[in-house]
């Protein structure tokens, strides 16, 4: 499996990705020893006969095992080579194979956090003694680690996924709607690293800072003590309470405050409920992507499409396509949007908020969405197999010219 010559910077201090383990195993019906490196989903098998003996005279399988044991993120490859007495070529071959199977991180990342620089390598081993005693640093390190379980497995992620999580600071999101789903989604996104989150009402006549009531309590962020407090204020207070990257109140200047917060312009809108014609037109003309979450009715809820103006099907494209397929059904669906807004059960609120948040993370990190040109209807009777409706740019719609 290991062959050819590789060039690797031996000053690097790589480490195996989170969740990657290794084990020496004997294959059935043979005495061939195998080292497996991986996590059960992806992995690498190395047999005794797949590695040429190294210059040290030790079996190459043992050298491979020794190399794996040394990949902890704080020892350079050159030092590892000296410690286990193997050639630079051997070390390079091992690293390149681990890179090929995306099982290794090659370097750490630097986070600029509340006027401080924090070195991070998906563990707190890199922290200085001062940082380790800093409560804010400890909190950040403890809370960012679970978030990296998503980003470290992105293709070509070499820093444990830290930079992807950190870049969410500059991805402002507007949530339209004041429902349980809206509040739960805002809380999850704040805890996932999105620093700039705002909510607004769906209708102009609705108070955007509508007070919290007992109906809003659904097992998430909202507590009985929040009743009577405006919903916009509650979402704003989330930054200090649960945000992964809270904004310090001690900023001496706006230089360290992300531009997305100094002047709020959303890069994505999440519309909980069908948007008004005015809001739809505003987002289209401003080239702002938006995701639609429809009403919960008959034990079902619809998510999508995620509209990227001029690039994917808009809600008018969907309307025109529905009109062609079934005018009567299209009329019924349109009328349903004029019904009074109703709250969803607590379990549905948490499920939908989590589902939306995972898709928003993928969209912010990678520019990908499971709801682009797609509407998914989730029924409580078959959550494992939602109905999928695929839409495309309609030839009679003018959104292509946006």
Annotated model-derived regions:
Residues 1-402:
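Adenine nucleotide-associated cytosolic modules
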